[in-house]
Amino acid sequence: MLKFTILGCGSSGGVPRPALGWGVCDPNNPKNRRRRTSFLVERHGTGGVTRVLIDTPPDMREQLLDAKVDRLDGVLFTHEHADHTHGVDDLRAFFIKQRQLVDVYVDAQTGETLRARFGYCFQSPPGSEYPPILREHRLVAGQPVTIAGQGGSITALPIVQAHGDIDSIGFRFGNVGNSCDLGGMPRDSAAALAGLDVWIVDALRERPHPSHFSVSDALAWIERLKPRRAILTNLHSELDYEALRQKLPPNVEPAFDGMTFEVEE
């Protein structure tokens, strides 16, 4: 059994946004308060829990405190953009507690960008008394990654996606797919998402966007791939939770922060 938690389902600015507020979202509905997109996968076993985190947004500290995460066995990154990476320094707490480098999994482009922005996390600068906190592993689309932990192993299949002028990485965990921040998908990637029980998929807003699925884009892909259940994520302040929920098909629903579900393998 795998447990999945949507730690954050908001777009790059979250909801509400400083100076810009709630957009069309009803501030009285707690499901409209959205932190930046992140996702947690857990396997519970007799020896404990294995936890894999997807992305380190600026809200990561609060997300992990709310989810009571006290140990991480690995972090998978979807891409280099700030709303998915700029909380990375807060992984330091896990380095301190676990007394070992935190294993992070990145494609070549994301690894290069993280080292340029947060090089001290990978190698101590000259004269610094602070040790590095991260150990880098390379993600290659189509090559599964297995992360071991106290609860057993979690395997993720990286899937390449188009995201404007860069590629991003989606992941498949058994029969659960996570596809945030994408505007298109190669044929081989679509094939890798066949037969899903649950698909968590980008649906930024109603209007088209050059590097994200709109709601109609997401629904068209859901109809094509036919997962049993679909959850829309990366939601902009232009999408009110309840208004969106009411017009979606029965097997499709909006995400909300803290949403959890379990899937048999």
State where each predicted segment sits.
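Binuclear metal-dependent hydrolase catalytic cores
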Residues: 1-179, 188, 245-264
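Catalytic metal-binding/acid-base residues of hydrolase active sites
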Residues: 59, 81, 183, 204, ...
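Binuclear metal-ion centers of metallo-dependent hydrolases, dominated by the metallo-beta-lactamase
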Residues: 142, 186-265
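Thr-Gly-centered strand-to-loop micro-motif
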Residues: 158-159, 179-181, 201, 232-233
